[in-house]
Swiss-Prot record:
Organism in which the protein naturally occurs: Shouchella clausii (strain KSM-K16) (Alkalihalobacillus clausii)
DNA-binding region: 28-51
Names of required cofactors: [2Fe-2S] cluster
Keyword set, alphabetical order: 2Fe-2S, DNA-binding, Iron, Iron-sulfur, Metal-binding, Transcription, Transcription regulation
InterPro entries according to UniProt: TR_Rrf2-type_CS, Tscrpt_reg_Rrf2, WH-like_DNA-bd_sf, WH_DNA-bd_sf
Binding note for cofactor: Binds 1 [2Fe-2S] cluster per subunit.
Gene name for this UniProt entry: nsrR
Protein residues bound to [2Fe-2S] cluster: 92, 100, 106
Function comment: Nitric oxide-responsive transcriptional regulator.
PROSITE patterns xref list: HTH_RRF2_1 (PS01332), HTH_RRF2_2 (PS51197)
GO molecular function: 2 iron, 2 sulfur cluster binding; DNA binding; DNA-binding transcription factor activity; metal ion binding
Keyword Nucleotidyltransferase on entry: no
GO CC entries: cytosol
Domain HTH rrf2-type per the UniProt entry, residue ranges: 2-133
Name the UniProt record assigns to this protein: HTH-type transcriptional regulator NsrR
High-level lineage: Bacteria, Bacillati, Bacillota, Bacilli, Bacillales
């Protein structure tokens, strides 16, 4: 299973913001530049994470973005479920579009459902805080300036 770039960018944005001092605002452009990802795509991600209550967006000249919750309150599994638009691993997961003739007797579908549930269960064991415990390494890779720490 491959996560969409939308979910990938969502998680990366949350990690970046978790590494910031508590009330420091960051700009979407700054984050997009550091990660070398599309500003427009990251803007959409930012808007959605704001609607989900995960980040706070402040408009205006001195505005920016920051986490709206503590990093330990943001569950990775929940973020993935909220940002992935399709967790259907195979066609038969969708009753409306399923055309597979094996569906009535297929055991693979059950195995894949079980695998997806296990995947999500593992993700649900982690929060954003868990993913930034190696904060010094991450800061170095993201080239945080000493004054930002």
């Amino acid at each position: 299973m491959q996560l969409t770039s939308y979910t990938d960018y969502s998680l990366r944005l949350l990690l970046y913001l978790a590494l910031q001092p508590k009330h420091k605002l960051s700009s979407v452009k700054q984050v997009a530049d550091i990660y070398r990802i599309s500003y427009n795509h990251l803007t959409k991600v930012t808007h959605e994470l704001g609607k989900l209550g995960l980040i706070e967006t402040i408009k205006g000249r001195n505005g920016g973005i920051r986490l709206a919750k503590e990093p330990e309150e943001i569950n990775i599994g929940e973020v993935v479920k909220q940002t992935e638009d399709n967790l259907e691993l195979v066609e038969c997961f969708n009753r409306e579009t399923n055309t597979c003739i094996l569906n009535p007797a297929c055991r693979l579908k059950g195995v894949l459902h079980e695998a997806l549930a296990a995947y999500l269960q593992v993700l649900e064991q982690y929060t954003v805080k868990d993913l930034v415990l190696n904060e010094d390494d991450l800061r170095a890779l993201l080239q945080f300036k000493t004054t930002e720490q």
